[in-house]
């Protein structure tokens, strides 16, 4: 098994697209990239921890490639917005591909360059590609939020879904 960590705004919206794929062992919502150990949701939302909401994906590379996961990642985000995603603003919601090793870094960078060259967006692709750090799982009530709180999930993801429909589908 291998690990991928992606930040694309609110972690609630980043679970379902990956969780439903063959070859995915688990998808956890959590926090990474900051300087506070074992942060809470409240602490991360205070924007004082340096952490970003993210998902940790454990996958079987014999069934799905890291490159495939990166391609799906792009289609869940607005890669031209460095200051958050959709309804969620600030560094704790910034888009980041966190890489585990040089191979993942190269795959992510090549994919980002390809997206920039495609002309799909008229603004620069600003999603960061950064080395992975400790991943701290979020509190239980955040896990698989789309299943446990479908009405709240639908409300919180409306702008995201409209953007994705217009720009990716």
Curated annotation (Swiss-Prot):
Swiss-Prot/TrEMBL catalytic activity: L-methionyl-[protein] + [thioredoxin]-disulfide + H2O = L-methionyl-(S)-S-oxide-[protein] + [thioredoxin]-dithiol; [thioredoxin]-disulfide + L-methionine + H2O = L-methionine (S)-S-oxide + [thioredoxin]-dithiol
Intrachain disulfide bonds: none
Keyword field contains Acetylation: no
Function recorded in the entry: Has an important function as a repair enzyme for proteins that have been inactivated by oxidation. Catalyzes the reversible oxidation-reduction of methionine sulfoxide in proteins to methionine.
SUPFAM superfamilies: Peptide methionine sulfoxide reductase (SSF55068)
Keywords: Oxidoreductase
Family indicated by similarity: Belongs to the MsrA Met sulfoxide reductase family.
Name of the protein described by the UniProt record: Peptide methionine sulfoxide reductase MsrA
Classification of source organism: Bacteria, Bacillati, Bacillota, Bacilli, Lactobacillales
InterPro entries: Met_Sox_Rdtase_MsrA_dom (IPR002569), Met_Sox_Rdtase_MsrA_sf (IPR036509)
A molecular function GO annotation: L-methionine:thioredoxin-disulfide S-oxidoreductase activity
GO BP annotations, alphabetical order: protein modification process
PANTHER family: PEPTIDE METHIONINE SULFOXIDE REDUCTASE (PTHR43774), PEPTIDE METHIONINE SULFOXIDE REDUCTASE MSRA 2 (PTHR43774:SF1)
Keyword Cell inner membrane in record: no
HAMAP family per UniProt: MsrA (MF_01401)
The enzyme's E.C. designation: 1.8.4.11
Active site per UniProt: 10
Main EC class the enzyme belongs to: oxidoreductase
């Amino acid at each position: 098994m291998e690990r991928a960590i992606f930040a694309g705004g609110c972690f609630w919206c980043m679970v379902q697209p990956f969780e439903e794929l063959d070859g995915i062992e688990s998808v956890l919502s959590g926090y990474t990239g900051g300087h506070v150990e074992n942060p809470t949701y409240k602490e991360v939302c205070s924007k004082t921890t340096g952490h970003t909401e993210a998902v940790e994906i454990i996958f079987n590379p014999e069934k799905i490639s890291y490159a495939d996961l990166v391609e799906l990642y792009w289609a869940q985000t607005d890669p031209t917005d460095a200051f958050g995603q959709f309804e969620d603003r600030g560094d704790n919601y910034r888009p980041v591909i966190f890489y585990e090793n040089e191979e993942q870094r190269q795959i992510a960078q090549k994919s980002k360059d390809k997206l920039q060259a495609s002309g799909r967006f008229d603004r620069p692709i600003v999603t960061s590609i950064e080395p992975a750090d400790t991943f701290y799982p979020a509190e239980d009530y955040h896990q698989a939020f789309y299943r446990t709180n479908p009405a709240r999930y639908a409300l919180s993801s409306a702008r995201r879904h409209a953007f994705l429909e217009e720009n990716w589908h």
